[in-house]
Amino acid sequence: MKESIMSFFNAPITNKVPSGVCSVAGLHAYISSDSHLKELTQRVRADTENDKAFRGKKQTLLPYVTPAGIFSYCREQCIMLPSGDFVIDIDHLASVEEAMMWRDRLFADEVLQPDLAFVSPGAKGVKLFVPYRLNLTDTLEHSFDNALHTAWDYLEWRHGLKADTANADMSRACFLAYDACLLYTSP
């Protein structure tokens, strides 16, 4: 396994210039142990019952990454280096416990083989960073789209889960949330 790297952006979401680059290993350490991220995640999750307040807090407080690679600016045409990963976002699960169960089950999936799996900012969802092969005879966009749609179809067929299709854009922001029990595949 290779170590994927991606752009890291400080909050708020209106900040489109990355503050740096991080690896999946660095994200593992940050998501599982950073006390400031833990406090921000708790503040965001305090408003999960009020969708407008939750969305506003998530967008103003939480940092985010672009799992598909390194970008000079958070826009698809500004990709500098692809990571070989894409994000799968499963939302609207019934409970935090169900989210943790799916995090663990999907991380163990032998077809998906995620590099990273954590409970999403809303606590009732899961985010997976899934590796894919870049095809030398295809464009980057085609390789990315093909892998993403294949994974979505597989998730629905194998697990009965619908992924959030808003993540079809390579530069799509993936908000980070504290998860002491996230799962990580070391290279």
Please report, for each region that a protein language model flagged, where it lies by residue:
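Signature for HUH/AEP ssDNA processing cores
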Residues: M1-K124, Y132-A147
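Short Gly/Ser/Thr- and Asp/Glu-enriched loop/turn motifs at secondary-structure junctions
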Residues: V119-G125, A168-A173
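Aromatic- and Lys/Arg-enriched surface recognition patch
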Residues: L140-Y178
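Conserved small/polar residues in nucleotide/adenosyl-binding loops
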Residues: Y184-P187
